[in-house]
C-alpha cells in the first residue's frame, strides 16, 4: 500500500466498487472471487469495523462457562440437589446393613434359641 492520500482514496473507491459488484479480493490471494457470502461479509466488516472476531464469544460468555456446574432453571437445581441427597442416603444405608447372601447358614451357625416356659393363660 502506498502512503499517498490520493492513492488511498483510489483504493477505498475500488473497494466500494468491489463491494457493490459482489466480487471481493481475498487477502491471501491476488485473484478476485465472486461469492455472495464473502461480499456480504465484506460489506458488514466495512460497515461495522469495531466488531472483531473473538474466537470463543464474548467475555461475559467465557466468564459464565468457566464458573463450573450450571443449571438451566431452579427445577434442574432442585432435581440435582435431591439426587445428591438420595445418593448419600443410599450409600449410608448400604454401609450400615449387613451383607447377606455370602454363605448358606447351617444349624451350627444359627444362635441357640432361648428356652421359654410357655404357660397357658387359661390354665391358671
From Swiss-Prot:
Record-level GO cellular component terms: cytoplasm
Biased composition (Polar residues): 113-124
Localisation per UniProt entry: Cytoplasm
GO biological process, one term: mitotic cell cycle
Keyword field: Cell cycle, Cell division, Cytoplasm, Mitosis, Phosphoprotein, Protein phosphatase inhibitor
Cross-referenced InterPro entries: Endosulphine (IPR006760)
Chain segments carrying region Disordered: 99-124
Pfam families documented for this protein: Endosulfine
Principal cellular location given in the protein's record: cytoplasm
Positions bearing Phosphoserine: 74
Transmembrane residue ranges: none
A GO molecular-function descriptor: protein phosphatase regulator activity
Family: Belongs to the endosulfine family.
UniProt protein name: Alpha-endosulfine
Classification lineage: Eukaryota, Metazoa, Chordata, Craniata, Vertebrata
Amino acid at each position: 500500500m502506498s502512503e499517498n492520500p490520493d492513492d488511498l482514496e483510489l483504493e477505498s473507491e475500488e473497494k466500494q466498487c468491489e463491494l457493490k459488484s459482489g466480487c471481493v479480493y481475498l487477502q491471501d490471494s491476488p485473484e478476485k472471487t465472486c461469492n455472495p457470502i464473502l461480499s456480504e461479509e465484506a460489506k458488514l466488516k466495512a460497515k461495522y469495523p469495531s466488531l472483531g472476531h473473538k474466537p470463543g464469544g464474548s467475555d461475559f460468555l467465557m466468564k459464565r462457562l468457566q464458573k463450573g456446574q450450571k443449571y438451566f432453571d431452579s427445577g434442574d437445581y432442585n432435581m440435582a440437589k435431591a439426587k445428591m441427597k438420595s445418593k448419600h442416603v443410599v450409600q449410608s444405608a448400604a454401609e450400615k446393613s449387613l451383607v447377606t447372601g455370602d454363605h448358606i447358614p447351617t444349624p451350627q451357625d444359627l444362635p441357640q434359641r432361648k428356652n421359654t416356659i410357655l404357660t397357658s393363660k387359661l390354665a391358671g
